[in-house]
A protein has these predicted regions:
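Hydrophobic alpha-helical segments and their boundary regions
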Residues: 4-5, 112
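Bacterial N-terminal signal peptides
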Residues: 6-15
Length: 173
């Protein structure tokens, strides 16, 4: 009987660990007036290769969009130089090691640099991505932001990859 109880407890512990290694985040459109409608979800899950990112998103323009984990768990508008900016309350790119380098998901710079999201002609993004230097536990208490344009993972010719305005956001709790 003790073996059966031990097996049940081990099974419960294993299943609770599996749940801890996955987060589904609701993504909302954002603008300089605040958080707007839901445009989809992103599922983050741990794998032996890193963080697997499964987007199920719509309603953004076709093409590549910069995609990052940001410092703070907020999608709110904030003001900079007297101008209200969408999602600015999320802060900058998640950079816990203070590298101040923008090197992309495979580099050793900001841990918040994710692979670019590709939105298809029907305005959807569903292709899975991999961030090799992250795990689900790293994301808790931060926001994920989708930018207007592509990201070149460099600070030249524009800072932070030149992704442009923040268009969508989700808080990772």
């Amino acid at each position: 009987m003790k073996i059966t109880h031990a097996m049940i407890i081990a099974s419960l512990l294993a299943s609770s660990s599996a749940f801890a290694a996955e987060k589904i985040v609701v993504i909302n459109a954002i603008s300089d007036v605040g958080v707007g409608k839901i445009i989809g979800t992103v599922k983050f899950s741990d794998s032996d290769k890193g963080l697997v990112i499964d987007p199920d998103l719509g309603e953004l323009a076709p093409g590549l969009h910069g995609f990052h984990i940001h410092e703070k768990a907020s999608c709110d508008v904030a003001e900079k130089d007297g101008k209200k900016t969408a999602g600015l309350a999320a802060g900058g790119h998640f950079d816990p090691l203070k590298t101040s380098k923008h090197e992309g998901p495979d580099g050793m710079g900001h841990k918040g640099d994710l692979p670019a999201l590709e939105f298809k002609e029907d305005s959807s993004a569903t292709r899975a991505l991999l961030a090799p230097h992250l795990k689900v536990a790293d994301l808790i208490g931060h926001a994920v932001i989708i930018h207007e344009g592509a990201d070149n993972y460099s600070d030249t010719p524009k800072p932070l990859g030149g992704g442009g305005a923040r268009l969508a956001c989700g808080v990772i709790e």
